[in-house]
């Protein structure tokens, strides 16, 4: 978009813990629209877990990015933006960024996946109630709205009287690539092995190897498919607390010839695997948020 066509009437600041690959396309689109009037504030370094998952970006810092944790000067700049901006979107970041602007009744959006992933029990009820009031309830008379990055977000907050009639659908917005469907399908393993004695299909799973994403379900599926005589190649991409368990499952079930675990890799490399896969498995339960990896695989 040409500079003269940009809407210069609105200054928007997006505040979160760090800039990841699933937020980057949205930020670039905002820069294309607003130019210098859009900024992303990172409040902490990217975690080691996310770096191991391949979340590191191509650039150390983008022109629109302010890493508030790196110096007092940048911290003050971030705090000033949080007050002065016409609109602030805040995710995983301290409320101290938005309290001054809410006192001035300035438009603010929080974004969140569902807060009650672990449910409500007698031993966590007091903590949940206090947290809801501290981070959400006390602001409800102000112009603050919720961007819900999960189908359950609005309902969870509404149970505590928060954001009723003030929720909007939201998510993570990975890059949407344009493909030639015919050319894309030619790259699939099923197409490459078509006509062979044993045509093969590729099956892909990608994400953090943690309990509620249930990567072990993929291994059990592979075991069933192999017993039934199907020819396939399954790939599980990612790292996490279940990694050793999954390697053991593959060995115990004698699946080394049809299941591989290459570990973590950059988002661009994962996308390459998606382009070649015939089938993508998404095994998460209701604890999943928006499902950015699912978005990418559907693209």
PLM regions and their residue ranges:
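Nucleotide-sugar donor phosphate/pyrophosphate-binding loop at the beta->alpha transition
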Residues: 116-142, 185-188
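Short His-centered aromatic/hydrophobic patch
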Residues: 89-95, 112-113
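Conserved donor-binding/catalytic core segment of Leloir-type glycosyltransferases
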Residues: 13, 185-186, 193-213, 219-222
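Short alpha-helical donor nucleotide-sugar binding micro-motif in glycosyltransferases
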Residues: 264-265, 272-277
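Nucleotide-activated donor-binding/catalytic signature segment of Leloir-type glycosyltransferases, i.e.
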Residues: 63, 245-265
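Short alpha-helical segment that forms part of, or immediately flanks, the ligand-binding pocket
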Residues: 271, 294-299
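Acidic donor-binding loop of glycosyltransferase active sites
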Residues: 275-289
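Donor nucleotide-sugar binding/catalytic pocket of nucleotide-sugar-dependent glycosyltransferases
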Residues: 139-198
């Amino acid at each position: 978009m040409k500079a003269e066509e940009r809407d210069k009437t609105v200054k928007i600041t997006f505040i979160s813990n760090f800039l990841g690959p699933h937020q980057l396309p949205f930020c670039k689109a905002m820069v294309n629209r607003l130019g210098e009037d859009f900024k992303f504030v990172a409040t902490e370094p990217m975690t080691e877990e996310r770096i191991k998952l391949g979340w590191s970006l191509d650039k150390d810092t983008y022109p629109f990015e302010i890493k508030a944790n790196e110096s007092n000067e940048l911290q003050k700049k971030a705090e000033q933006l949080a007050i002065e901006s016409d609109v602030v979107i805040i995710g995983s970041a301290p409320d101290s960024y938005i309290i001054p602007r809410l006192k001035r009744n300035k438009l603010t959006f929080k974004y969140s996946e569902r807060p009650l992933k672990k449910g409500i029990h007698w031993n966590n009820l007091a903590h949940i109630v206090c947290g809801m009031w501290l981070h959400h309830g006390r602001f409800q008379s102000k112009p603050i709205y919720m961007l819900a990055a999960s189908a359950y977000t609005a309902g969870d907050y509404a149970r505590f009287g928060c954001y009723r009639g003030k929720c909007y659908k939201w998510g993570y917005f990975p890059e949407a690539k344009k493909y030639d469907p015919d050319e894309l399908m030619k790259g699939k393993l099923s197409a490459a092995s078509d006509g062979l004695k044993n045509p093969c299909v590729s099956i892909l799973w990608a994400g953090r190897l943690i309990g509620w994403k249930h990567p072990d379900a993929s291994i059990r599926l592979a075991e069933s498919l192999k017993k039934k005589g199907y020819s396939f190649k399954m790939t599980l991409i990612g790292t996490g607390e279940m990694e050793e368990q999954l390697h053991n499952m593959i060995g115990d079930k004698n699946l080394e010839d049809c299941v591989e675990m290459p570990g973590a890799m950059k988002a661009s490399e994962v996308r390459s695997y998606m382009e070649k896969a015939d089938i993508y498995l998404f095994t998460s339960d209701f604890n999943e948020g928006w499902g950015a990896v699912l978005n990418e695989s559907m693209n």
